[in-house]
Amino acid sequence: DIEALLATPFEGATVKEALVEKTATIGEKRSIRRFEKVSGDVAVSYIHGGGRIGVIVAANGASDDAAREALTNIAMQVAAMNPTYISRNDISAEELAKLQEITVDAALNDPASLPKPILNKLIDKAMNSSAWSDEDKAIYEEKKSNMNYLFNFLSKEAAAALAELAMADKDAIVSDKIFKGLADGRVSKQLKEICLLDQTYVKAEDGKQTVAKYLESVNKALTIAKVVRFEVGEGMEKKNEDFAAEVAAQING
């Protein structure tokens, strides 16, 4: 409720009065478009780039200086890496199923990345049908001794035809143990990118420590309750800038 927030006492006035005063001071209108309320044993904030990105991290289990420092580091991580979820447990079954479906379809539409046994079956179908032109069939016969470079020589139409064959045979391919391992690996990689606790901690000395392991090294009782990330113009048309690289440079510099 933004109206309730505007009426909230703030530094001897109300939030609304403070905004009016700020507008008068800088000559530019200031308004609140959205806000988040957080709660926990401790909460820290981090502002990047003169206010272009703001992050709040709330946690439970500890509130000492070490916990605050750790959460500030995590807030910088959130500013740079912009995770979608705190942990995998926050992803609904529907969202996970959608991610898996997208990953499977992406793999099938990129035949060059498919496991060799599956790719070879698709090529056999293309060679024994009209899916490929005579020219592409000849190219395959010439280059099949080195499959790693085959797609450098096949036409775009030939690659697209293999993708169509793969999608048509989707049920059988998805049930293949080798393909399942490939798809599961790609999903796991994506989860590590979008889940904060699974991300590699940006200040990890070994380049491998996850955020979860970093928090555990600070205090095993420290758990993240909520993360809020705001970016100027978020949800509105804006110039695309590489905030992530800028924050990462600040962290490492």
What are these regions (language model features)?
Residues 1-253:
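N-terminal assembly/interaction segments in proteins that build large macromolecular machines
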